[in-house]
Amino acid sequence: MMGKKERYEIILAGSGGQGLVLAGVMLGEAAVLEGRNVVQTQSYGIASRGGLSLAEVIIDREEIIYQQVQEPDIILALTEEALEKYAALAEKGVRIFYDTTLAKPRAGANLTGYPFTKIASDLGNVASVNILSLGAMTAAVPMVKTESLAGVIRKRFQGKALEMNLEALRKGVGLI
């Protein structure tokens, strides 16, 4: 497990509809709750559902001058296309978490695969894959506290969606 750093540059990559932009916003909100500075950007492929979707998050204790990820520390790849795009960065020390449900398993240092989509589906809602994978990432790399993410989830959701997303967060954290 990495020690606590001052700055994290994170890329969340997958396909439109997987909730990665929301995950990036929520990660940023959790960092703000902890008194950190945050920049969050996103881009979409040709189709909002199905095309490559990217969310970038920079978390820093200092002021953030350049607002795009230049040297990612952590990448979440929820599709084969996303993993293909970034897999080579693992050799340069970038920690990559990927979904073995939708991407071919790979061996190598800094490559960590979990069946995020299958677990989310087993929980009863594949849409919770974003929060489940955030739980695993933040448990492995302490960029924000799990309690901060849970607080953001409590502010954004209610009723059954709240319960489901808190359970997805717990399941993700439990993978590590």
Regions from the language model: what does each represent?
Residues 1-176:
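Active-site cofactor/cluster-binding pocket
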